[in-house]
């Protein structure tokens, strides 16, 4: 009888301990996601970075590079994602598409927005990769000039170059892409 009680107590203790163990996620899953998306900024670099001169990739023209605010980066890096908006995005216009009237004036009627599959953003660099059905793999690597950006922000945007980089879409690469800053509407 005592043996049955001891065996029952041992089984009960084993089940109690087993229920306390936490389920583990596959090794590397969260680290892999967070490693693909990284921002380490100490200043507000948010805004629209627009080409100083036209940048063409086939029929597509770069409209802007967008950098969000710190909270938008944190939301994305925390796993909350949108299919239409990211903290770093590139937008292209189909230069062959008809022009239409918008609240900001005339714009091409067909655009392609490229959301990130990877980014690394600091106070002085922007490294971005994404994909779009229209352009395929898109990459941008740029150097940000903090002093020029500070001047542009004080002046609420101007024509001065604040970032210079290399843009690749599909199999075409454009070097020395020069961007100015605009805070947006």
Short names for language-model regions:
Residues 1-18:
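Sec-dependent bacterial lipoprotein signal peptides
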Residues 20-23:
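Bacterial signal peptide processing site
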Residues 25-29:
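Helix-termini ("caps") and immediately adjacent flexible loops/tails
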Residues 33-185:
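Central antiparallel beta-sheet cores of small beta-barrel/beta-sandwich binding domains
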